[in-house]
């Protein structure tokens, strides 16, 4: 019945050629497709709002990160009539291409070490605006740009919301390491409490480990639920061979989420110690 309500114009033809199982699969795919369309539209809306509400009118240097939602950030910035008045600093290869593809001027952080504002994505966000980043293996340059910025704005979809870091992001904390040290660091990380540590592989695209833009390796260390991200980050940074970690603490000003409903939720870190649901309620 649901199938016939969704596609009444195809009722006779499709019922003739598809079994009930095929019909159910088609409906499931259609619902999933519509859901993903809503999410994608919300991501775009979140990115546009983030730019419109936060970009200083006289900004001269803008940081642009990576991620599926940041694509829309670059798109929105590329629509600005004064885009020739500022330069954009990338956090890696993908964001460099986003800058170029949207007709923006590409700058280097060596030439522009002070950045007015940066926009980036995240793999997971808790209510205190702590982040896990580095799923795209760009964490060091992302943190460099973020730390050089007067303001960091994060854009993502609702699936990145979490009560605690490590609750939804199960791949572990990304850690950029000097290649020669990775074996020793695996042992060090386990001694610090990591349940598992994996050297990230290139998969089908590359035989062997992932190589970062800085010619380093990425270790993914699963610490489970992370109650104190700042403390863990400081412990990890003390290990010889660690370049930086994917734990971003005390650096984010605001987060824009594209919701499944097609709406946008914002977190600003004002509500402390609340559950994700309470923060969402406060934000709407």
Curated annotation (Swiss-Prot):
Per the record, the pathway is: Carbohydrate degradation; pentose phosphate pathway; D-ribose 5-phosphate from D-ribulose 5-phosphate (non-oxidative stage): step 1/1
Q: Which GO terms describe its cellular component?
A: cytoplasm
InterPro entries membership: NagB/RpiA_transferase-like, Ribose5P_isomerase_type_A
- Enzyme Commission number, as recorded: 5.3.1.6
| Main subcellular location | cytoplasm
Gene3D superfamilies under this entry?
3.30.70.260, 3.40.50.1360
Tell me which UniProt keywords the record has, alphabetically.
Answer: Cytoplasm, Isomerase
Q: Name one GO molecular function term.
A: ribose-5-phosphate isomerase activity
- Entry-linked PANTHER family: RIBOSE-5-PHOSPHATE ISOMERASE
Q: Which family does it belong to?
A: Belongs to the ribose 5-phosphate isomerase family.
The protein, known as: Ribose-5-phosphate isomerase
Q: Which organism is it from?
A: Lodderomyces elongisporus (strain ATCC 11503 / CBS 2605 / JCM 1781 / NBRC 1676 / NRRL YB-4239)
Q: Tell me what gene encodes this.
A: RKI1
